[in-house]
Swiss-Prot record:
Chief location: cytoplasm
Reaction catalysis annotation: D-erythro-1-(imidazol-4-yl)glycerol 3-phosphate = 3-(imidazol-4-yl)-2-oxopropyl phosphate + H2O
EC numbers on record: 4.2.1.19
One CC-aspect GO term: cytoplasm
Top-level class of the enzyme under EC nomenclature: lyase
InterPro entries tied to this protein: IGPD_sf, ImidazoleglycerolP_deHydtase, ImidazoleglycerP_deHydtase_CS, Ribosomal_Su5_D2-typ_SF
Subcellular localization: Cytoplasm
Involved pathway(s): Amino-acid biosynthesis; L-histidine biosynthesis; L-histidine from 5-phospho-alpha-D-ribose 1-diphosphate: step 6/9
Domain of life, per lineage: Bacteria
Gene name tied to this protein: hisB
Similarity annotation: Belongs to the imidazoleglycerol-phosphate dehydratase family.
Name of the featured protein: Imidazoleglycerol-phosphate dehydratase
Amino acid sequence: MRTASITRNTSETAIAVELNLDGTGAYSVATGIGFLDHMLEQLSRHSLIDLTVKIDGDLHIDQHHTTEDSGIAIGEALAKALGDKKGITRYGHAYAPMDETLTRVALDISGRPWTVWKVDLKGPRLGEWDTELIEHWFQSFAQAAGITLHVENLYGTNQHHIVESCYKGLARALRTAVEIDPRKADSIPSTKGML
C-alpha cells in the first residue's frame, strides 16, 4: 500500500499526519483553524486520498506556523507515500467550478518544487483564517511534496468559493497524478529514469 505517516514536532507545532494514496477520501482533520480544517477535508474527499491530520499549534501567537507546518507535513507524507514514483501518471490538472468561481490547477510530480499562484484574495480573513496564509500553505505543500504546482483563479467574487475551488482543483489534479497507469506500472514516468 502507498501510505505514509509523518510526525513533526517543533517548538511551534506538534503535527501527526497519516495518508493513504489509494484510499476513498476518508478524513479526520483537527488543526485548530476551522476554515483550514474544511479545506483539508475537501482535499481528502475529492482526491480520494485518506488523510488524518492532528495539530497542536501556537495559535495563541498567530496561525502562521500551524498553516505552514500543516502544508509541509502533508507534502512530506505525499512524497513518502509516492516512494520511487514508479507507475504514477505524474501529471494532473483540473478545472474546479464553484458557483460564480472557476479555478484551474495543474501539477507535475516532478521532484522540482515550484509554485505559481495567481489568486487575488481581497479580504483579510476567511472565518478566523488569515487569507495571506493560504498562498503560503500551497507553497509549503508543493515544496515539501516536490511538485510543480500552478494555481490560477480565472474568475470569481466570493472568497470562500475561490479558496475552496483552489483546494478542490488541487484535489482533483492530485487524484489523476498519483494514479497508477497499468501500462507502465513498473517504470518511472521520465526519460531520465528518475523523478
